[in-house]
Each structure stands twice: as structure tokens, then as C-alpha cells.
Regions:
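A charged, solvent-exposed segment within the mature domains of Sec-exported extracytoplasmic proteins
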Residues: 1-4, 98
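Metallo-beta-lactamase
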Residues: 3-79, 87, 91
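Accessory terminal helices/loops
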Residues: 56-61, 69-129
């Protein structure tokens, strides 16, 4: 098991070595905007560290905690979640408002579902600045 902070405190990911599977809890998102509104700069780093721990297990399949039910369980969603968080952090520094951050992220990730999660995340990030 991997315990860490992601979109909430005390997220747990379960590793089943016999079938090379990770059930990622809230650590990995699959084609959904991650809910970053419950975290901050330190939390982003903890989330990225959790993704590193999950990736180090070298699973063949990862069941994401959030995403459309018809999506695959490809481990590439670990890296996609990591890149999303890093992009969000970078654009948070490069933009001047929640709306600008939201719009820039939507341009980069137009096919992800739940834009309300992105909007809440952008508002929280800019309120902390």
C-alpha cells in the first residue's frame, strides 16, 4: 500500500503484485481534471511523490480513482496525472487570474471531463497567491 496526500489527506493506493495491478485511490486521474483545490504547493509535491511511489511499483494496470468508467487502466495515466499537476503549477505562476489559469488549462486539456473541478482548483490556487 502507498499512503500519501493527494486531493485529500491520507489517500491510499493498493498494489496487488500477483496481477501487477494498482488501485490508485485519488492519486491517479484518468481523463478527468484533477481536483487540486484541496491542496497547496506542499501538497502538490506530496502528490507528485505519491505518483513516483506508484510508478516505482511498475504496474501493468492502474485503476484510476477518477475517470470515465469506459477508459482503460493504462499505467500511462500516472505520468499524465503528473504532467497535469506540473503544468497547473507552472501556469499558476504564469497567469494573473483564476479565469486565465482555467482557460489556459482548458486549452491544453480540452477533452478531460469535469471542468468544474478545474475551476475550483484555479480559484483556490489564485486565492492563495
Amino acid at each position: 500500500m502507498v499512503n500519501s496526500k493527494t486531493d485529500t489527506d491520507d489517500t491510499t493506493a493498493l498494489h496487488i503484485p500477483s496481477i501487477d495491478l494498482v488501485i490508485s485511490g485519488d492519486a491517479v486521474y484518468n481523463e478527468t481534471h484533477p481536483y487540486l483545490a484541496e491542496t497547496d504547493t506542499t501538497g502538490y509535491q506530496e502528490w507528485l511523490a505519491a505518483l513516483d511511489k506508484i510508478e516505482a511499483l511498475n504496474p501493468k494496470a492502474v485503476v484510476a480513482g477518477h475517470g470515465p468508467p469506459d477508459q482503460d487502466s493504462n499505467p500511462s495515466h500516472i505520468d499524465k496525472t503528473r504532467n497535469y499537476i506540473k503544468t497547473f503549477v507552472s501556469l499558476n505562476q504564469a497567469t494573473s487570474s483564476a479565469l486565465e489559469l482555467y482557460e489556459r488549462m482548458l486549452e491544453l486539456y480540452p477533452d478531460r471531463i469535469n471542468p468544474g473541478s478545474l475551476w475550483a482548483s484555479a480559484r483556490k490556487a489564485k486565492s492563495a497567491v
